[in-house]
Amino acid sequence: MKLCATFLLVLVTLPLVTGEKSSERSLSGAILRGVRRTCSRRGHRCIRDSQCCGGMCCQGNRCFVAIRRCFHLPF
């Protein structure tokens, strides 16, 4: 138990000693600010593939289930 407490203490104080500033873009910071990154489901609006949930592609501004890897025709 003492080893665990010591380890946590070192992790907390290490950035203070090295002079690092904590990032506001950390996951815990996002949770505290209420920022959530969610994915769009099938049929929902999207702009790019990364906005759709896993295994889906963005085509025609809507997410759809992809049988194969996402591809886009050059228009």
Swiss-Prot record:
Its main location: secreted. The keyword Isomerase does not apply. It is found in: Secreted. Disulfide bonds join 39-53, 46-58, 52-63, 57-70. It comes from the Eukaryota. GO terms for cellular component: extracellular region. Keywords: Disulfide bond, Ion channel impairing toxin, Neurotoxin, Secreted, Signal, Toxin. PROSITE patterns: I_CONOTOXIN. Residues 1-19 form the signal peptide. Expressed by the venom duct. Residues 20-36 form a propeptide. GO terms for molecular function: ion channel regulator activity; toxin activity. The cysteine framework is XI (C-C-CC-CC-C-C). Both natural (L-Leu form) and synthetic (D-Leu from) peptides equally cause sensitivity to touch and body tremor. Neither L-Leu form nor D-Leu form is active on nerve-muscle preparation. Belongs to the conotoxin I1 superfamily. This is Conotoxin ar11a. It comes from Conus arenatus (Sand-dusted cone). The lineage of its organism: Eukaryota, Metazoa, Spiralia, Lophotrochozoa, Mollusca.
